[in-house]
From Swiss-Prot:
Protein name (record): Chaperone protein DnaK
Keyword field: ATP-binding, Chaperone, Nucleotide-binding, Phosphoprotein, Stress response
Region (Disordered): 602-644
GO MF, one example: unfolded protein binding
Function: Acts as a chaperone.
Phosphothreonine PTM sites in chain numbering: T199
Family indicated by similarity: Belongs to the heat shock protein 70 family.
Pfam families (alphabetical): HSP70 (PF00012)
Annotated source species: Teredinibacter turnerae (strain ATCC 39867 / T7901)
Intrachain disulfide bonds: none
Amino acid sequence: MGKIIGIDLGTTNSCVSVLEGDKAKVIENAEGDRTTPSIVAFTDDNEILVGQSAKRQAVTNPRNTLFAVKRLIGRKFTDDVVQKDIKMVPYSIVGADNGDAWVEVKGDKKAPPQISAEVLKKMKKTAEDYLGEKVTEAVITVPAYFNDSQRQATKDAGKIAGLEVKRIINEPTAAALAYGMDKAKGDRTIAVYDLGGGTFDISVIEIADVDGEHQFEVLSTNGDTFLGGEDFDLRLIEYLAEEFKKSNGIDLHNDPLALQRLKEAAEKAKIELSSSQQTEVNLPYITADATGPKHLVVKLTRAKLESLVEELVNRSLEPVKMAIKDADLSVSEIDDVILVGGQTRMPLVQQKVAEFFGKEPRKDVNPDEAVAMGAAIQGAVLSGDVKDVLLLDVTPLTLGIETMGGVATPLIEKNTTIPTKKSQVFSTAEDNQTAVTIHVVQGERKQAAQNKSLGRFDLADIPPAPRGMPQVEVTFDIDANGILNVSAKDKATGKEQSIVIKASSGLSDDEIENMVKDAEANAEADRKFEELVSARNTLEGLVHATKKTLEEAGDKATAEEKSAIEAAITEAEEALKSGDKDAIEAATKKVTDASGSLAQKLYAEQSAQQQGSAGATGGEQPKADKAADDGVVDAEFEEVKDDK
């Protein structure tokens, strides 16, 4: 059985890890980095770039470079947070036929799980390159405060990427696993403060020793799925754009290219101000008007940045208060505070968290890697490689159904340990009612309409009876991924109806299947592209070596040989321009055949010379042969370079 890898699918960056022995190892990608930007770009020649290569070309291709797509996953186009994002990103966010928020690239609508799947494919390939074997199973992390549709959409992304998602695990819980596995025995309560690129989570977790087993029990969780480093960047972008408008009268929001440059500069300045007190944002030729080019130069202090984002940091403390209250603890009962997510490197965040908890947060957890490492540990627990760990997670939001008067009646309260199952009996609202609609909602509001609608289904053929008489038993069953199954049963007839909640919209099985096929087709195109590059490199190396041999052979080559070789080289150069793999391979054969007799002649001559000087110092290797050797090495080097 292959390894189950752990993937932290982040808003800004992603990370992949695997358990080696009893330690989780973060795997470096092809570029040598331990994290990969969660950025996907579509180029003019229909190539899909993922990670650093996509990030590098974002400034010149802003409309087709997609970042922070995790913020859209499992969301409706009409959601306020989505509408706010539309104004802030250079790419196009559109409404899908089912009402979900999708993105549009080159006139083609794509679902967020499709884009996330490209990042997951890169993570899968990174793990496969390292392990030297196929990887088909993964544990993928999500923000603890993700609702059911967002979890389902993340599973869909895994499926599109060719992965069987063995478990969806909450990010703070994963970080606690990574932290708690190598700590001394004994019971303690920790708070995981997870401020990532796009989401914020807080979980209160009790780590206990139960009969030699590490037990991780989540006591409570809370958060905000639209608060993260991207929002800190946006505050800074707004400030820089406003300063530029004041001095130049030009609004940079209308220029996607300028907006993309601003985003990069804001992110860089924010990171620099974590270690220095002042920095300068300098963007020459940011735009132009009738009077000529305009440059943006703004001095920025740490104090200014902190004043711009202090409200965001304070906003994160509200869910923290709720989580501690829900865990039925006081702040002083928290033994350790763990910081996770790149945004927690900001001194202001560390200061506010330390002030709130009355203790310094731990510094021995890598905020970018802990989540992926925890996912890898959970993968090893599921595969049986790790046996002394028990993980008890919770559902983050209350689940219930809509009852008479539009009230949300809870069946499973938030922070209930999962997996769990709960049943409740309801009845009809009118006389002789023969069908009931079960409307499933998720959230903390008393009014059903103000909560997230997860889906609805009908239980029909109820025998007519006075209102309040029929007994309809509704059962909620949450699995270990936090994904819900709902069934309704008429107790009189035994008739039952059930659904797996896939959100009130989401992707259908057919859509997912088509996206899987599409992803496989892309993989085939990638393979063909690699074969073409390999063939091209081989021919280029051969042409170079043959030219060199011909030049150094001088008058040892007959006019006929020279003419045949030059004709083959001309044809080869044309084939290289064409980009046709078959033509390139045919040209490679022609060059090899045309230069074969000359190569044999030179080799025979060299052998004769070596025999003539036998017993001497061995003589110098003839130049022509040396050149031919050089050529072979050149060609091999090119191929290796391509396969890197």
